[in-house]
């Protein structure tokens, strides 16, 4: 399941973020890649724990925790702190699958990468190329969103970033360990939750709503890992 979550940052915030990123000291993106992924990774990245990355990441997570669509789809349990990357002309990241487990720097806890997220920070007209290409059950999906928009997709997906041929592509990315590890089960719960919310708006007093809501929570109780 691919999910588009729009408008997490406004134009003024994004302009300030990009101005700060233009002045930042970048490191080789291979530093946070696994052995196989490093062979395909050609980009720049703010070092893990960088003050600017922490500031952007904290604001992003705070907004997502208040976003009903994200919470319903991801059912988050743990999050790997967001990282920030930069693709300049020629930068790309070939097809790869993210490592199954991530351990934040300085933390004893590991995060299972059930879900991957990318927040686009550059206006799509400001660079050519740089599409996020995700392979799913419906074939290849090319994603190039407006600045401030996020895409959420299964961590099991084969994906790549096409070469940037003009301009600079800034983005934030992170991984979520869900309460429900199986994508098909999360998708079913997301659809059911959406249906419950729509029915609540349309027929708020319908007696079947109580039963349907109970079924949702019983499925979540069966599948959740805490």
UniProtKB/Swiss-Prot annotation:
Q: Which UniProt keywords apply?
A: Dioxygenase, Iron, Metal-binding, Oxidoreductase, Vitamin C
Cofactor(s) demanded: Fe(2+); L-ascorbate
Any one Pfam family match given in the protein's UniProt record, by short name: 2OG-FeII_Oxy_3
* Nuclease is among the record's keywords: no
Q: What is its EC number?
A: 1.14.11.-
Domain of life (superkingdom)? Bacteria
Q: Does the keyword Iron apply?
A: yes
The residues that the entry says bind 2-oxoglutarate are: 169
Q: Which residues bind Fe cation?
A: 96, 98, 159
Q: Entry's PANTHER family?
A: PKHD-TYPE HYDROXYLASE YBIX
- Name of the molecule in the record: PKHD-type hydroxylase PputW619_4316
Source organism of this protein record: Pseudomonas putida (strain W619)
